[in-house]
Amino acid sequence: MIRNGNQVTYETRGETLVIHVGGEIDHHSAVAVRTGIDEKIASERPQKVMLELSGVDFMDSSGLGLIMGRYALVKQYGGTLSVLDPSPAVVKIIKLAGMERMVSILRTKTKQ
């Protein structure tokens, strides 16, 4: 699905929902991206959610809100949320916000 220039695709791996997000996550796009993700999480109620953010080339505080809101949503269902293969831009803002203490960052790809 493409919304506001962002590409969001979903992949289910057993009890894990992998959400691939590409493009920019800012105040212009975050609401549309968040709405689609929330609908998918609510319908599937996965035990694990992985936000795969290797294709995100820009993220501002709206992106941090998107991650933390999904973290809280998944936690309500007893699940966990991780950030998978974040781009350097995403890692930078997550670390600046101190969020790596709350949300695990997983890497399956070698650093770029």
Predicted regions and their residues:
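STAS-like cytosolic regulatory interaction modules
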Residues: 1-57, 72-112
